[in-house]
């Protein structure tokens, strides 16, 4: 059985949460499956991911017509670190030859993210400084902005870790129920529901605002 992938709690944490009486008593494969499924359920519920890319990746983000001075990033492309970060605009050639400079052309928001004591491990909006805009326009409208960065979050918040653990424990306990979710193969089918009251409360501060665009 393959181990956990981009998980927000560990299998050992889940063993402890379930009160395993003797190490190794609980089946490893089902524990791993519960942790992975719970982690992806958290992603789906919050609209973002808390695991960090190992190397910089690139995405194209369309600027907003209504607010060309702000560039909202999608939930799978929040910026986890300024190391390796580049922001470039295009004039229609596809070369993305104009690089924007942090703290000159734009600044990252939330401003205090990834600082000591901050609850946020990522930035999800670029704010143009002065007259800087993100909507470089051509004959066919605005061109997208290319963002290169290690996306995700720099750390997993304690609330996210605990919510994942609670959801994973609930999923594992369902293994004995008829047609329990762990009996079939689609991890994507697992969701945080109204019955997950504690999970919802823990994640309440990390759900992306529906007004965010990207």
Model-identified regions with their sequence ranges:
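Divalent metal-cofactor coordination and adjacent catalytic microenvironments
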Residues: 1-214
């Amino acid at each position: 059985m393959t181990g956990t992938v981009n998980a927000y709690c560990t299998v050992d944490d889940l063993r402890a949460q379930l009160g395993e009486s003797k190490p190794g008593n609980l089946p490893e494969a089902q524990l791993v499956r519960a942790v992975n499924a719970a982690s992806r359920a958290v992603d789906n519920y919050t609209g973002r991911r808390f695991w960090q890319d190992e190397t910089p990746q690139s995405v194209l983000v369309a600027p907003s017509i209504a607010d060309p001075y702000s560039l909202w990033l999608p939930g799978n492309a929040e910026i986890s670190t300024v190391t390796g970060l580049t922001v470039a605009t295009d004039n229609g050639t596809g070369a993305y030859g104009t690089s924007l400079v942090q703290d000159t052309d734009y600044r990252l928001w939330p401003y205090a993210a990834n600082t000591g004591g901050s609850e946020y491990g990522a930035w999800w909006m670029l704010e143009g400084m002065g007259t800087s805009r993100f909507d470089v326009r051509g004959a066919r409208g605005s061109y997208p902005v290319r963002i290169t960065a290690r996306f995700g979050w720099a750390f997993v918040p304690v609330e996210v870790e605990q919510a994942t653990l609670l959801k994973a424990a609930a999923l594992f306990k369902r293994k004995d129920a008829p047609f329990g979710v762990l009996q079939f193969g689609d991890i994507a089918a697992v969701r945080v529901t109204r019955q997950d009251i504690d999970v919802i409360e823990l994640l309440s501060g990390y759900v992306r605002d529906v007004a965010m665009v990207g």
